[in-house]
Amino acid sequence: MGSSRFLVLMVSLALVTLVAAEGVKGNIEKPEVCPADNVRCIKSDPPQCHTDQDCQGIRKCCYLHCGFKCVIPVKELEEGGNQDEDVSRPCP
Protein backbone atom coordinates (compact mmCIF):
# COMPACT_ATOMS: atom_id res chain seq x y z
CA MET A 1 0.00 0.00 0.00
CA GLY A 2 2.84 2.42 0.88
CA SER A 3 4.70 1.83 -2.38
CA SER A 4 1.61 2.62 -4.49
CA ARG A 5 1.19 5.98 -2.70
CA PHE A 6 4.85 6.71 -3.32
CA LEU A 7 4.42 5.89 -7.02
CA VAL A 8 1.38 8.19 -7.31
CA LEU A 9 3.33 10.98 -5.60
CA MET A 10 6.31 10.56 -7.95
CA VAL A 11 4.11 10.54 -11.08
CA SER A 12 2.31 13.67 -9.85
CA LEU A 13 5.61 15.47 -9.25
CA ALA A 14 6.86 14.48 -12.70
CA LEU A 15 3.72 15.88 -14.36
CA VAL A 16 3.96 19.16 -12.45
CA THR A 17 7.61 19.50 -13.48
CA LEU A 18 6.78 18.91 -17.16
CA VAL A 19 3.96 21.46 -17.14
CA ALA A 20 6.15 24.07 -15.42
CA ALA A 21 9.01 23.52 -17.89
CA GLU A 22 6.64 23.93 -20.84
CA GLY A 23 5.54 27.33 -19.56
CA VAL A 24 9.11 28.55 -19.13
CA LYS A 25 10.28 27.74 -22.66
CA GLY A 26 7.31 29.54 -24.24
CA ASN A 27 8.90 33.02 -24.02
CA ILE A 28 12.14 32.44 -25.90
CA GLU A 29 13.11 35.51 -27.92
CA LYS A 30 14.36 34.91 -31.46
CA PRO A 31 17.75 36.31 -32.55
CA GLU A 32 18.37 39.56 -34.42
CA VAL A 33 16.39 42.78 -33.89
CA CYS A 34 13.18 44.38 -35.05
CA PRO A 35 13.41 46.85 -37.93
CA ALA A 36 13.48 50.55 -37.02
CA ASP A 37 10.02 52.13 -36.91
CA ASN A 38 9.89 55.90 -37.36
CA VAL A 39 6.15 56.06 -38.07
CA ARG A 40 4.09 58.28 -35.75
CA CYS A 41 0.70 56.76 -34.96
CA ILE A 42 -2.46 58.40 -33.69
CA LYS A 43 -3.94 55.02 -32.78
CA SER A 44 -2.37 51.55 -32.53
CA ASP A 45 -3.71 48.65 -34.61
CA PRO A 46 -4.87 45.45 -32.88
CA PRO A 47 -1.87 43.15 -32.27
CA GLN A 48 -1.32 40.29 -34.71
CA CYS A 49 1.13 38.68 -32.24
CA HIS A 50 2.21 38.97 -28.60
CA THR A 51 5.57 37.11 -28.48
CA ASP A 52 8.12 35.81 -30.99
CA GLN A 53 6.66 32.34 -30.47
CA ASP A 54 3.43 33.52 -32.15
CA CYS A 55 5.38 34.02 -35.40
CA GLN A 56 6.38 31.30 -37.86
CA GLY A 57 9.93 30.61 -38.95
CA ILE A 58 12.46 33.38 -38.38
CA ARG A 59 9.84 36.13 -38.04
CA LYS A 60 9.75 38.18 -34.82
CA CYS A 61 6.86 39.92 -33.11
CA CYS A 62 7.73 43.60 -33.55
CA TYR A 63 5.93 46.91 -33.10
CA LEU A 64 5.99 48.26 -36.65
CA HIS A 65 3.71 50.68 -38.47
CA CYS A 66 1.30 51.21 -35.57
CA GLY A 67 0.92 47.66 -34.29
CA PHE A 68 2.57 44.41 -33.25
CA LYS A 69 3.02 42.07 -36.23
CA CYS A 70 5.26 39.23 -37.39
CA VAL A 71 8.10 40.65 -39.48
CA ILE A 72 11.44 39.48 -40.83
CA PRO A 73 14.10 40.74 -38.38
CA VAL A 74 17.27 42.60 -39.32
CA LYS A 75 20.82 41.86 -38.16
CA GLU A 76 21.22 45.41 -36.80
CA LEU A 77 19.22 48.62 -36.76
CA GLU A 78 18.84 50.23 -40.16
CA GLU A 79 20.50 53.54 -41.04
CA GLY A 80 18.58 56.39 -39.43
CA GLY A 81 17.07 54.24 -36.68
CA ASN A 82 17.48 55.31 -33.07
CA GLN A 83 20.45 53.24 -31.88
CA ASP A 84 19.61 53.93 -28.22
CA GLU A 85 15.99 52.79 -28.46
CA ASP A 86 15.06 49.16 -27.75
CA VAL A 87 12.68 48.60 -30.68
CA SER A 88 11.95 45.00 -29.68
CA ARG A 89 9.82 46.13 -26.71
CA PRO A 90 6.45 47.91 -26.58
CA CYS A 91 6.38 51.64 -25.99
CA PRO A 92 5.25 52.81 -22.53
Curated annotation (Swiss-Prot):
Family matches, as PROSITE patterns: WAP (PS51390)
Disulfide bonds: 34-62, 41-66, 49-61, 55-70
GO MF assignments: serine-type endopeptidase inhibitor activity
UniProt-listed GO biological process terms: defense response to bacterium
Principal place of residence: secreted
Compartments (UniProt record): Secreted
Keyword vocabulary terms for this entry: Antibiotic, Antimicrobial, Disulfide bond, Protease inhibitor, Secreted, Serine protease inhibitor, Signal
Gene Ontology terms: cellular component: extracellular region
Signal peptide residue numbers: 1-23
Residue ranges constituting the WAP domain according to the UniProt record: 27-74
Function: Antibacterial protein. Putative acid-stable proteinase inhibitor.
Xref: PANTHER family: WAP FOUR-DISULFIDE CORE DOMAIN PROTEIN 8
Protein name stated in the entry: WAP four-disulfide core domain protein 12
Organism in which the protein naturally occurs: Aotus nancymaae
Gene: WFDC12
